[in-house]
UniProtKB/Swiss-Prot annotation:
Protein's recorded name: Dihydroorotase
Taxonomic lineage: Bacteria, Bacillati, Cyanobacteriota, Cyanophyceae, Synechococcales
Residues modified to N6-carboxylysine: 100
Residues that bind substrate: 16-18, 42, 137, 220, 252, 264
Top-level taxon of the source organism: Bacteria
One term under GO cellular component: cytosol
Length: 343
């Protein structure tokens, strides 16, 4: 195995950058590793207007050094009463790259999300017509559905009807966690894709309970059984262009993360690419990493491939237990790869 690999500069197709002081702390990790990132809109209040997206984009850009060459790609937060005209205007003005569907109360700051798909029928028709991607947090929230089954049930109950009713709509099922999601996306046409996180390639649901209750491994969707983790690895490393990188890095301050009712989210941004590289190397699939990290996403979104390269050097790197007051994924572990600056 080579001691060095070079990749076309990658993108992160799903990240939470937060806002305010938290944004200033976390955005450098993403902006110095990736050239572009799809930024989630679940702020308080959520990003539901073109003006709000512009203001948020300005806040992100202000926190970045110009030499990083980073471009945030903004998304709209869909609600029951969002206007189709606002979505279309934001897309045509180059402000909204995509729109995000959060089922109401499915995850962090999703209380204002969509309660029933019929409420956004007009929006989805417009998005289908103009070629605007729909990004989906694919879980049902019914109390009678087991938390480990919520993604699989969502596919049957909601995603299949969306695909049937809006066949021309471009859809990304984000941060997939199940074999069912892999199979559904893998059997679909070019209008359906999925992002895969680094943590779901490394952990199964046992990680949350290893030696106690491990809140730093709690995210939504939750990690599943080992067979699902292995299915995600096969998908990510298959070379199938329907699967691409999306970290879902989701930082939370430690008091909220480590409380009796801890927040869902894993902060993986500081070492995301090294984490992916470790997984791909473990399965002897490093030759598939560039397509997953740098090529498949732009192809789906209809964007140019980045210029420049990044280099990963085989060199042990100890992950700190805490960075900027946040606990990172792989805290206390040694990663076998080290990212060199983008050129």
């Amino acid at each position: 195995m080579s001691d060095q690999i070079q990749l076309i500069a990658p993108d992160d197709w799903h990240v939470h950058l937060r806002d305010g002081e938290m944004l200033k702390q976390v955005v450098p990790y993403t902006a110095q590793m990736f050239r572009r990132a799809i930024v989630m809109p679940n702020l308080r209040p959520p990003v539901v207007t073109v003006e709000a997206a512009k203001a948020y984009r300005d806040q992100i850009v202000a926190a970045c050094h110009p030499n990083w060459g980073f471009t945030p790609l903004m998304t709209a937060y869909l609600t029951d009463d969002i206007a189709p005209e606002e979505i279309e205007r934001g897309f045509h003005e180059g402000v909204f790259t995509a729109a995000k569907l959060y089922p109401a109360n499915a995850t962090t700051n999703s209380a204002a999300g969509v309660t029933e798909l019929r409420h956004i029928h007009g929006v989805l028709l417009v998005m289908e017509r103009i070629g605007m991607p729909l990004l989906i947090h694919g879980e049902v929230t019914d109390v009678d559905v087991d938390v480990f089954d919520r993604e699989a049930v969502f596919i049957e109950r909601s995603l299949k009807p969306i695909r049937d009713r809006y066949p021309g709509l471009k859809v990304v099922l984000e941060h997939i966690t199940t074999e069912q999601a892999v199979d559904f996306v893998g059997s679909a046409d070019q209008n359906l894709a999925a992002t895969i996180t680094p943590h779901h390639l490394h952990i199964n649901r046992n990680a949350m309970f290893a030696g106690g209750l491990r809140s730093d491994f709690y995210c939504l969707p939750v990690a599943k059984r080992e067979r699902h983790r292995l299915a995600l690895r096969r998908a990510a490393m298959s070379g199938d262009r329907r699967f691409f990188l999306g970290t879902d890095s989701a930082p939370h301050a430690r008091p909220g993360k480590e409380s009796s009712c801890g927040c869902a989210g894993i902060f993986n941004a500081p070492h995301a690419l090294e984490s992916y590289a470790m997984a791909f190397a473990q399965d002897d699939k490093l030759d598939k990493l560039e397509a997953f990290a740098s090529l498949h996403g732009p192809a789906f979104y209809g964007l140019p491939v980045n210029e420049g390269i990044v280099t990963l050097q085989r060199d042990d790197k100890l992950v700190p237990n805490v960075v900027n007051g946040l606990v990172p994924f792989h805290a206390g572990e040694t990663l076998p790869w080290r990212l060199q600056p983008c050129t």
